[in-house]
Amino acid sequence: MAKYIMAFDQGTTSSRAIIFDRSGKIIASLNQEFKQIYPKAGWVEHDPMEIWGTQIGVAKGVIEKAGINPEDIAAIGITNQRETTVVWDKNTGKPIYNAIVWQCRRTAPICDELKNKGFDKKIREKTGLVVDAYFSGTKIKWILDNVEGAREKAEKGELLFGNIDTWLIWNLTRGKVHVTDYSNASRTMIFNIHELKWDKEILAELNIPEQMLPEVKPSSYVYGYTDKSIFGVEIPIAGDAGDQQAALFGQACFKPGMAKNTYGTGCFMLMNTGEKAVPSNTGLLTTIAWGIDGKVEYALEGSIFIAGAAIQWLRDELRIIDNSPQSEEYAMKVEDTNGVYVVPAFVGLGAPYWDMYARGTIVGLTRGAKREHIIRATLESIAYQTRDVLEAMQEDSGIRLQALKVDGGASANNFLMQFQSDILGVPVDRPQVIETTALGASYLAGLAVGFWNSREEIEKNWNVDKHFEPAMDNEKREKLYKGWKKAVERAMKWAEE
């Protein structure tokens, strides 16, 4: 009887493999970084062969590290950096170009063209996304337009496209299976999230042949089996979801209105909206959360560009702290920020403002302002930005948030989590296992093979490490938030010519 599930967590900077047991505990984990390629300013690439090599290397290594046999693994679940695009030759299995990474801005001119034609409104309606170089559609077009002979080969059916999940599954099955899941497909900008199929009109506009696209399947499903030559046995590949959606699943956000926030360099916030695709009027993305149990569920997504990165700025540029955990210690030394607000709009502001010309600001300074006040105000800015996004989510969905589940590096900061709860006026829950992305992929795989029987069973695995209850009265909460809104106004449009 197989006792474990293995997750592949293929991220932007590293490939990781984690082995989980039935209670969702980590048995072993292994991680390997790979090369970031920057051919020109604003361009970012990865070598798909290196991604495959590092991912299979950590998978074999983690089995050894855990001291188990490949036969002990019931299934593999895959989660991945979203939007990153690979095009390869069907016959040789070799990529015709490096993977174009989600961060890469090279296709901005193609996006501008779509906007100038007014085609962006159509894309927004059909895919739930804004037209941006971030998503896969324009990256595929760029490869077909710029790699010699690519378009002819694609039209003859000799080329295949995939995001990283598709590329890994194709290699694990030695080319037998060309597939993706609903959550990853919903980030390509060419998938109709209402009709649940590749959109012929968008494909025609971008001149992408449909035969190069993978089949789209549920997120919890046996797609195929690993080729025997890889692990010595055939293991079912049974779960697939983009990283942020996998984290939503790993956090057991199964009901409409449940939300999670991942506090990393930036923040990614997703709210489950159930079987209803909620269009956003506030600059959020409408996306597929997952496809499971014969239906698709949707989410609203908002991203904050600068969160944990603001704490790094205090450490590396201002040098007023020596390490990130120290920020909590200093923030606790003062009762408040003494009227100081920091707006960390270092690269503009994301949802719900979408102001590329906003710049970082410190306001409310007086002669009594100390280092502690600036540090505390920087931490508080992460919580204020989270409230901005959540207010937008509540406005779009009409659903009131009951509690916020948190994960990611900065969720370890107790001061920040308590202030987050205070400023939202809702409880904040930090789980014991914060590797929620890999956990979500494991759950999806385990459900498909009967390792777990239901979402209810999974929910029982979700345990709170720390629960934060709001301790601030409403009058104070609203007064502080009003001050934040004023500070944001001062930061907006600053860099406009």
Curated annotation (Swiss-Prot):
- Residues reported in the UniProt entry to bind ADP: T12, R16, T265, G308, G409, N413
Q: Which residues bind glycerol?
A: R82, E83, Y134, D243, Q244
**Superkingdom of source:** Bacteria
What catalytic reaction does the record list?
glycerol + ATP = sn-glycerol 3-phosphate + ADP + H(+)
Q: Which UniProt keywords apply?
A: ATP-binding, Glycerol metabolism, Kinase, Nucleotide-binding, Transferase
Q: For binding ATP, which residues are annotated in this chain's numbering?
A: T12, T13, S14, T265, G308, Q312, G409
Q: PROSITE patterns recorded for this chain?
A: FGGY_KINASES_1, FGGY_KINASES_2
Q: Which InterPro entries match?
A: ATPase_NBD (IPR043129), Carb_kinase_FGGY (IPR000577), Carb_kinase_FGGY_CS (IPR018483), FGGY_C (IPR018485), FGGY_N (IPR018484), Glycerol_kin (IPR005999)
What is its EC class? transferase
Q: Please name the pathway.
A: Polyol metabolism; glycerol degradation via glycerol kinase pathway; sn-glycerol 3-phosphate from glycerol: step 1/1
EC number(s) per entry: 2.7.1.30
Name any Gene Ontology BP term.
glycerol metabolic process
Positions contributing to sn-glycerol 3-phosphate binding: T12, R82, E83, Y134, D243
GO MF, any single term: glycerol kinase activity
How its function is modulated: the record gives: Activated by phosphorylation and inhibited by fructose 1,6-bisphosphate (FBP).
Residue span of the signal peptide, if any?
A: none
Which GO cellular component does the record give, naming just one? Answer: cytosol
State the HAMAP family in the record. Answer: Glycerol_kin (MF_00186)
What protein family is recorded?
Answer: Belongs to the FGGY kinase family.
Q: Which PANTHER family match?
A: GLYCEROL KINASE (PTHR10196:SF69), SUGAR KINASE (PTHR10196)
Q: Mind telling me which NCBIfam families this protein's record contains?
A: glycerol_kin, PRK00047.1
Its biological purpose is as follows: Key enzyme in the regulation of glycerol uptake and metabolism. Catalyzes the phosphorylation of glycerol to yield sn-glycerol 3-phosphate.
Instruction: Cite the record's note on assembly.
Output: Homotetramer and homodimer (in equilibrium).
Name the record gives this protein: Glycerol kinase
